[in-house]
Amino acid sequence: MASAARSASRAFLRSTPTTSSFRPAVRAARFALPAQGFRAAGRRGYASEANSGKSSSNVFLWAGLAVAGGAGAYLYLNGSDSVTSKTFVPGKEDYQKVYDAIARRLADETDYDDGSYGPVLVRLAWHASGTYDKETGTGGSNGATMRFAPESDHGANAGLKIARDFLEPIKAQFPWISYSDLWTLAGACAIQELGGPTIPWRPGRQDKDVAACTPDGRLPDASKDQRHIRDIFYRMGFNDQEIVALIGAHALGRAHPDRSGYDGPWDFSPTVFTNEFFRLLVDEKWQNRKWNGPAQFTDKTTKTLMMLPADLALIKDKEFKKHVERYARDSDAFFKDFSDAFVKLLELGVPFTSKAEDRYVFKTSE
């Protein structure tokens, strides 16, 4: 049902002229949350006096905790001060429960832009991953260092506290998942729940401390041209086709003057993942917007949409433009290429122990 509804939405959008004021309803599906399969509980052990045996046990306890922290293992002290090991190794079903919890929260919480937090979750996953530098091996989704200043204060990350806070109840419900895995899983979930392509995903990211924060300037600057775009994306290891596909995420959401300085949505359906961004980029006439903000463009037909200087650079550059035109004509090609590029983005710099063929494919909500 969900896939049929998404297909119908995309088909309707393809037949809707650019002057349409169509705004699709947000997914309102409801489903029961699966019961959590375990409880992470810590009981502090107290002893009236120390002896060599207890000291040795404590050494092993803390060593065990240090090793187990990234693997979902929990150690407990029982009433007799002995150590009991309970190991929890999450599998696909456990991550599906996390996915379902995010999807339900997206359906329930509709008090954000255009009725969905989905677009800002995609932006969080994108910005957490897009700091990767292939030469130094630093940055990327492994670490979730946007939890800390100065990275959380970088201009490109303005407004993403909303997305991070949105996911805190999910983190509390599933404390075993790292923030790094949670943020990227949330991005994959949002893409699928908003009608986009399947995003295969795998766990394995570990959170890092503030020392791993990346320097400012690694994310794309919307005011720049194609040379800047290539500099940013080539640094991560993407080619021109992948660059255009990833920028297609602008099909979702809108810009905010109090964050990026820009204003407005890119298309008429900012909570449905489509190829409309490319269709409008090619078919619509774009003119400079006259306002007090930074330079941006507005559509000549309705004057309600916007494009960024970096967006227009995609059709000014011959190599970029051929991919824009292909995606404008072929939604299926865009969906496939976006999925491949987004999976690559989410995995940059992650020291996985699993293989690519072990990625999970999550069921969408009904």
Curated annotation (Swiss-Prot):
Catalytic reaction list: 2 Fe(II)-[cytochrome c] + H2O2 + 2 H(+) = 2 Fe(III)-[cytochrome c] + 2 H2O
UniProt source species: Aspergillus fumigatus (strain ATCC MYA-4609 / CBS 101355 / FGSC A1100 / Af293)
General function of this protein: Destroys radicals which are normally produced within the cells and which are toxic to biological systems.
Protein name per its UniProtKB record: Cytochrome c peroxidase, mitochondrial
Keyword Metal-binding: yes
Catalytic site: 127, 266
Protein's GO biological process: cellular response to oxidative stress; hydrogen peroxide catabolic process; response to reactive oxygen species
Cofactor descriptive note: Binds 1 heme b (iron(II)-protoporphyrin IX) group per subunit.
Family: Belongs to the peroxidase family. Cytochrome c peroxidase subfamily.
Keywords associated with the record: Heme, Iron, Metal-binding, Mitochondrion, Oxidoreductase, Peroxidase, Transit peptide
Pfam assignment, any one: peroxidase
Cofactor requirement: heme b
Quaternary structure annotation from Swiss-Prot or TrEMBL: Forms a one-to-one complex with cytochrome c.
Keyword check for Membrane: no
